[in-house]
Amino acid sequence: MTARKILLYPKDKEALRAKSESIHAFNKRTKQLIEDLKDTLIAHTDGIGLAAPQINVHARVVIVRLKAVSDGSREADPPIALINPEIVEAGDERRDFDGCLSFPGLYGETVRPHYLQVIGLDESGKPFDRTFEGFDAVVVHHEIDHLDGVLFIDRIEKFEDLYRVYVDDDGKPVRVPVSQIVGVGKEAIRISDVAE
């Protein structure tokens, strides 16, 4: 088991913003990368997706745990790998919960497709053409964004949509807008300033 260090924003901003290269040979190194990504995701039990750039490997590989729900009320399936994933169709855009292991404790509401058709290779190196719907589509879209250096904060439309989640005395999650935490109006601060 090799859990790798997850890059954090803004410290590792340059690496997280870099675009990833396609996998051209499905070999032992690719298999090891997939295992490292899975081990890293499993070690971070609150995560449902991880992209290779988040462990400082700029290859087009993502790991996702499907069948999760945005409120965390259902345990996700075991992680699967998508290699060289390419979105061929997207639709049904909606606002939904978004977060990222590279931004610990920071969450937001973003607009993402709730329908995706994706082609690529599975973890055996075999081609796939797969449809993802609902929150699964949100997760897959988020992870594919990482491969192009796009981060979830880039998709935040309003400062008020960015928040931290705390657990109250009853053990229930409470969303606190970042604007309340930093104590300044949205005119005085950009979303990227909060993340940095």
Task: Enumerate the predicted regions with their spans.
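Active-site rim/adjacent substrate-binding subdomains
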Residues: 1-141, 146-196
